[in-house]
């Protein structure tokens, strides 16, 4: 009770301090900072695989694995940043600190490109003299690590911080819409303009532009400081969930009766939870809320929080267990996206990237095809398909169906990548090996790679928003802000596991070699397509059980 009273008093003081702050005056500072941070992150991370191959003489598959691991870290870091903000420091200090860390990271990236002493010497074939030294790798990995830390405190925290500036749900929705537009816009701009500068002009200039964008982001977020509402840290809701598991284990031998008066309810900001009855789903957890001797004080408050939880906490934990199978079905979906993106970059490096006599499309910019497809698909869904659906049916399309359709189209996109690779490999085989020197370009335009990525982009427009909507509906009220963060965890696991799958394909099957033209990339794509098809069956089963 004392702990709860203390937290409520902190909230009251914090609300009084923030009463005359916030609103639309804060949006230019927050959105502008998001724009700068997004450009900085995309400029540094979007072309990392190519940077490792061209400037650090990494083998293609090794660079692809490192790229996937780093992408996984930058995807997982925002979830850790959100927990740190909620539990310890609040959003604003974490946002400012992380933005400064990102800036330092980009300064280090710029130095690696500007000074040849921080890179191995260039050479036509890999030899001991071409391998980067331990010091050079340490400097590079420090820059990468700082960028991961910086991304962890800015991406989702900026959304939470911005939403806190508004009282109206409508205003928050408008802010979220603009934030999503900015996120996609910076991804497209960073993956084209900054990557083009890095590939065609100078790596140092490209990283320098990213550093400048990051510096502007830091200045903007600081300039608006006097206008912000600053949410205070109120403790992590995950502690209550952990208590449920511990309490249920401790009371594994307790016999629970039908007497509702023996369940702990406590006080809650949600009035209906005071008299909430424990459900029979996962009934073995109900004993965590069963009052035993010594669990409560004379005034009825909980004396042993790791032995007794409220019914609301137990039901919150159950809701997470119920959604977990559906969440797990999305992991392989993310794995397939990670593999397709990284293999597409490796394919593009071998293909004809010229677009006219003077322009060449950077290999790292191929991801834009998927981003543009996603944006166009979202606009069509929002402005055409969903309004038409509402006219024909009184019920909006359920998230589960939207996610399921995304699964199917994603499999089609991976299969399309396999067919494009079959054509590319056949062209490689049709040319004599002696004509394939080190800089030999496959006489096939890389625009062939656009179609599979566009199909996958349509799938992303269906299953990603569908998952966010599903998690927001299914998660307990105390974890609504964490619900959208679960997507970060899915993306992170997808990149980690895709790196592991690439390594398995190289070590076990031999399908992937250092020379992509001598590899059997088509087989990898067909394997992934088959796995995603099986995973769709698993998703359908989970959806049936969930409903």
Locations of the language-model features?
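Hydrophobic transmembrane alpha-helices of multi-pass solute transporters/permeases
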Residues: 2-121, 130-547
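Beta-strand-rich luminal/extracellular ectodomains of secretory-pathway glycoproteins
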Residues: 126-127
């Amino acid at each position: 009770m004392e702990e709860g009273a203390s937290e409520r008093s902190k909230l009251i003081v914090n609300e009084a301090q923030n009463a005359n702050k916030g609103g639309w005056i804060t949006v230019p500072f927050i959105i502008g900072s998001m724009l700068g941070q997004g450009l900085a992150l995309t400029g540094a991370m979007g072309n990392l695989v190519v940077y490792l191959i061209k400037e650090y003489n990494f083998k293609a598959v090794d660079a692809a694995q490192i790229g996937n691991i780093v992408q996984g870290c930058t995807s997982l870091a925002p979830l850790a940043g959100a927990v740190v903000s909620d539990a310890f420091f609040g959003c604003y200090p974490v946002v400012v600190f992380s933005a400064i860390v990102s800036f330092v990271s980009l300064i280090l990236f710029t130095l690696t490109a500007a000074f040849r002493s921080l890179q191995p010497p260039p050479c036509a074939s890999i030899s001991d003299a071409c391998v980067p030294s331990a010091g050079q790798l340490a400097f590079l990995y420090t820059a990468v690590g700082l960028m991961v830390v910086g991304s962890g405190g800015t991406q989702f925290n900026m959304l939470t911080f911005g939403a806190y500036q508004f009282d109206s749900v409508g205003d928050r929705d408008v802010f979220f819409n603009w934030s999503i537009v900015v996120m996609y816009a910076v991804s497209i701009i960073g993956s084209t303009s900054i990557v083009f500068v890095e590939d065609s002009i100078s790596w140092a200039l490209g990283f320098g532009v990213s550093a400048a964008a990051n510096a502007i982001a830091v200045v903007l977020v600081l300039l608006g400081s006097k206008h912000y509402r600053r949410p205070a840290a109120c403790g992590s809701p995950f502690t209550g969930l952990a208590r449920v598991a511990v309490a249920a284990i401790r009371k594994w031998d307790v016999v629970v009766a039908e007497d509702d008066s023996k369940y702990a309810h406590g006080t809650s900001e949600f009035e209906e939870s005071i008299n909430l009855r424990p459900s029979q789903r996962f009934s073995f957890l109900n004993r965590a809320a069963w009052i035993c001797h010594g669990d409560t004080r004379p005034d009825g408050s909980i004396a042993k929080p790791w032995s007794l939880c409220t019914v609301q906490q137990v039901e919150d934990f159950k809701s997470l267990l119920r959604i977990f199978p559906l969440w797990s079905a999305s992991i392989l979906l993310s794995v397939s996206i990670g593999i397709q993106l990284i293999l597409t970059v490796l394919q593009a490096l071998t293909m004809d990237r010229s677009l006219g006599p003077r322009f060449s499309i950077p290999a790292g910019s191929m991801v834009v095809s998927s981003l543009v497809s996603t944006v166009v698909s979202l606009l069509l869904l929002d402005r055409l398909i969903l309004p038409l659906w509402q006219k024909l049916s009184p019920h909006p399309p359920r998230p589960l169906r939207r996610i399921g359709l995304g699964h199917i189209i994603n499999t089609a996109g991976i299969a399309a990548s396999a067919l494009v690779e079959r054509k590319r490999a056949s062209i490689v085989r049709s040319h004599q090996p002696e004509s394939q020197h080190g800089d030999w370009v496959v006489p096939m335009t890389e625009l062939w790679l656009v179609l599979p990525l566009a199909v996958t982009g349509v799938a992303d427009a269906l299953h990603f928003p569908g998952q966010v909507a599903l998690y927001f509906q299914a998660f307990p009220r105390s974890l609504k802000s964490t619900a959208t963060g679960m997507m970060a965890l899915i993306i992170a696991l997808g990149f980690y596991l895709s790196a592991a799958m690439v390594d398995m394909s190289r070590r076990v099957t031999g399908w992937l070699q250092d020379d992509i033209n001598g590899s059997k990339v088509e087989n990898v794509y067909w394997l992934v397509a088959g796995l995603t098809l099986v995973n769709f069956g698993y998703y359908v089963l989970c959806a049936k059980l969930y409903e």
